[in-house]
Amino acid sequence: MPLIIDADVIIRGERGLFDLPAWLEKQADKGPQIAAITLAELWHGVERATRTFKARREAYLQMVVETLPVVPYTETTALEHARLWAALEGSGRMIGFYDLIVAATALESGSAVATFNSRHFSQVRGLKVIVPK
């Protein structure tokens, strides 16, 4: 099953709290990717970084972009996103907006989500969630 990597996994790697390159190497057979919204979240972090950290964050993100293909947000993803949003909102189990888009991207592409935020993603029916180790 393909694997969509959540921003928190990449951020922990950038902060030295998780060995992202080693873990990604072990996941190579799953075709790890990132959702387009995740790329936006990560670039936002680069843009907000202080001058001291900006170059390092940008270099790390470049490594991520060169390593992980980006799954686009398509019209089909938008429909999955809307359905998921309505279902979670209606059940009172709403999750963060960006997490919702990552989940919709994963469901639409038949992928699992790798995240340290399993509490949110486990609210999504039918979504396989993997906590990296």
Predicted regions and their residues:
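Short, structured coil segments at secondary-structure junctions
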Residues: 28, 66, 124-125
